[in-house]
Amino acid sequence: MAFALLFTQPGADVVYRIERSAGTGVVVFVLGGEMDSEHAARLRDLITVDAECRVLVDLLDVTFVDRAAMRFLARVEAQGVRLVNCPEYVRRWIAAENASHQENPMPDPSVNMTEDRFTSTDGLNIVFRSWRPQGQPRGLVAIVPGFNSHSGYYTWVAEQFVAAGYAASAIDLRGRGKSDGERFYVAKFADYVADVTAFVHLMKSRQPGVPIFLLGHSAGGVVSCLYATEHQTELAGLICESFAFRLPAPSFALAVLKGLSHVAPHAHVLRLKNEDFSRDPHAVEAMNADPLIAHETQPTNTLAEMVRADERLGQEFPRMTLPLLILHGTADKASQASGSQFFYETAGSKDKTLKLYEGHFHDLLNDVGREKVMADITGWIDAVLTRA
């Protein structure tokens, strides 16, 4: 005799079917849809490993939205759960993750992680994820991802902050990740800045008195810099990683792009190569399989707005007085390290640090050698708070 139960998680597209065979003592979880860290944490509560019962998880129709969900699979497999129909890219990632954890065991990414949202000034639902340490955090790091990214890519980063005693929150910019808005389009970069302003304000209201650091990656660094120029007293420090201030395109091409944005603002004209983000093949495979960025191309207006924002920032750097940490890889093909160098040289801050990583690609925190970059960031935050 066998029976099956079909159900969905509230407000999600993940479908679970539980099949139990009374005669064999086997329970099969058949999954379908998009799986992220939040859904993985919920599934964990459903799976129990019993000496009298074998548990199988069928992954034939699953698409993984972030690394944390794949990391969850590594943990349940280690507990005796059998994975069937596991995609090859997931299997390779799990093998690499297991090997890494033998040297550096990490905490469960689902612990103290929450997904939430707020409403933007123009009525959009803006999604963000938060991670908290046990007890009062020493500080909070608000993370602004760039293009070809979203908050789900910062689970490992958040784990490191939590291990160091810091809380972390990462936003999905409008039109990206799980947030509302036309996909990958923004009318004005000021809309991004308004969303980050609301995001930081919300973090401060939830963690009163806790120093806040803003970490922006690539285009997220441009947004973070724009915010910081107007709200320096709100932040304990600004971290710009792979700052998209200077782009690998000739000036005449950027001028044409700005002109085209007035004629065809919604035309999608640029597709960034995931292979240029990381030297880690497992990271690239995960990006290629991520439905939230799988078909990401940038509209003319989004790109033109970033160019205009960069032009404005070039005049604003001398006004920057808050502590700055600027990070860039020398082999970055998506943004130029010379832009970070210029920011460092012209910023008015007395407390500023520039670190260039030889041979590193665009996404320093998703690249080979990310542990060194992460240690530099947490060490810098520790030092800033010590001097405060």
Mark where each language-model region is.
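Catalytic active-site module of serine/aspartate enzymes centered on a nucleophile-bearing elbow/loop
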Residues: 355-388
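Conserved alpha/beta-hydrolase
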Residues: 158-181
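STAS-typified acidic loop motif
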Residues: 5-45
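Catalytic nucleophile-loop/oxyanion-hole region of alpha/beta-hydrolase
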Residues: 148-151, 177-207, 373
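N-terminal cap/lid segment of alpha/beta-hydrolase-fold proteins
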Residues: 106-135
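Short beta-strand/loop motif that positions the catalytic acidic residue
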Residues: 320, 326-328, 332
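Amphipathic alpha-helical interaction surfaces in cytosolic regulatory modules
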Residues: 29-103
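Alpha/beta-hydrolase-fold enzymes
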Residues: 217-298
